[in-house]
Curated annotation (Swiss-Prot):
Chain positions recorded as Fe cation binding sites: 27, 74, 158, 162
Organism for this UniProt entry: Plasmodium falciparum (isolate HB3)
Assembly mode: Homodimer.
Cofactor binding note: Binds 1 Fe cation per subunit.
Source species, domain of life: Eukaryota
Name of the protein this chain belongs to: Superoxide dismutase [Fe]
GO cellular component labels: cytoplasm
Known EC number: 1.15.1.1
Catalytic reaction(s) noted: 2 superoxide + 2 H(+) = H2O2 + O2
Keyword Transcription: no
Entry similarity comment: Belongs to the iron/manganese superoxide dismutase family.
Enzyme class: oxidoreductase
UniProt key word Transmembrane helix: no
Gene that this polypeptide is encoded by: SODB
Function in brief: Destroys superoxide anion radicals which are normally produced within the cells and which are toxic to biological systems.
Length: 198
């Protein structure tokens, strides 16, 4: 089974001005595509060549895991954002955030602090844990909650420097602030609904 680069659900300029076309082009067509190409090279003629991407993420380690997880994480990140998104949450995710964090503003502040305070490269996640509570998680490098079994991902934000350096240089806080204008709450609601059924 050849791993392919998932198609973006919006144009490269669709997230502008918050994330520029130049950033998205490099991030998607160079970084994300690079992980796909590298993984296919690494798994050729191994048992992983017959497995799905998700199974590779769950079962692998080392370079194979790093590339597989980065493919999965990036696809989830693209889907966590969209044009004409952002603003306040709605539907079940709004109610669940209020239940588990007290208010959307509390959640937004806590999540932003985690994203801005994370040392080095990694990811910030909103996830549903084993007690059916929403939690904020941070993972280093290619890590994710699926591999760590710490929760079911609901949303993610990429905090590797390549996600924001063209647009914001070393100002991660401005990138995080801009990211809130792109959050796809419909995607979060879909993930929450599926996660609550498990």
């Amino acid at each position: 089974m050849v791993i392919t680069l998932p198609k973006l659900k919006y144009a490269l300029n669709a997230l502008s001005p918050h994330i520029s076309e130049e950033t998205l082009n490099f991030h998607y067509n160079k970084h994300h595509a690079g992980y796909v190409n590298k993984l296919n090279t690494l798994i050729k003629d191994t048992p992983f060549a017959e497995k799905s991407l998700l199974d590779i993420v769950k079962e692998s380690s080392g370079a194979i895991f790093n590339n597989a997880a980065q493919i999965w994480n990036h696809t989830f990140y693209w889907d966590s954002m969209g044009p004409d998104c952002g603003g306040e949450p709605h539907g079940e995710i709004k109610e669940k955030i209020q239940e588990d964090f007290g208010s959307f503003n509390n959640f937004k502040e806590q999540f932003s602090n985690i994203l801005c305070g994370h040392f080095g490269s990694g990811w910030g996640w909103l996830a549903l844990n084993n007690n059916n509570k929403l939690v904020i998680l941070q993972t280093h490098d290619a890590g994710n909650p699926i591999k760590d079994n710490t929760g079911i991902p609901i949303l993610t934000c990429d905090i590797w420097e390549h996600a924001y350096y063209i647009d914001y240089r070393n100002d991660r806080a401005s990138y995080v602030k801009a990211w809130w204008n792109l959050v796809n709450w419909n995607f979060a609601n879909e993930n929450l609904k599926k996660a609550m059924k498990k």
